């Protein structure tokens, strides 16, 4: 679950910026889906965890594999994500070239977005 300070605001951003589908929403907790991956958002509410914005750092990163990482990242940056930290580029790997880059969303979460080459290599 990604900690966010305002779940409705975060749901709106993820839908607009990343094309997320809202699966369910209880106000302070919601389930979303992006590119076939389900994830949850929630407001910490002083129950032992906190959002990266309040902590001043993040302890996790979200990784997404998709057909067009350039477009995915560009859409997020256009909607307000910080795309300056991990510019998209080709990486040489044991299975060939893997295109990947990243951004930090407005809620402080690090996202790495790459093409599907690792999935094709490890699941075929």
Regions inferred by a protein language model and the residue ranges of each:
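Short, surface-exposed ligand-recognition loops at beta-strand->loop->(often short) alpha-helix junctions
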Residues: 2-6
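Vicinal oxygen chelate
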Residues: 1, 11-104, 113-124
């Amino acid at each position: 679950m990604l900690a966010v300070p305002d779940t409705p605001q975060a749901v709106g951003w993820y839908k607009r910026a990343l094309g997320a589908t809202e699966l369910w929403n209880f106000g302070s907790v919601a389930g979303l889906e992006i590119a076939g991956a389900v994830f949850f958002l929630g407001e910490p509410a002083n129950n032992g965890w906190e959002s990266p914005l309040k902590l001043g750092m993040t302890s996790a990163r979200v990784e997404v594999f998709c057909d067009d990482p350039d477009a995915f990242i560009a859409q997020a940056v256009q909607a307000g994500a910080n795309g300056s930290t991990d510019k998209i580029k080709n990486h040489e790997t044991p299975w060939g070239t893997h295109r990947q880059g990243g951004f930090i969303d407005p809620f402080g979460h690090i996202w790495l977005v790459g093409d599907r080459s690792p999935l094709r290599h490890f699941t075929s």
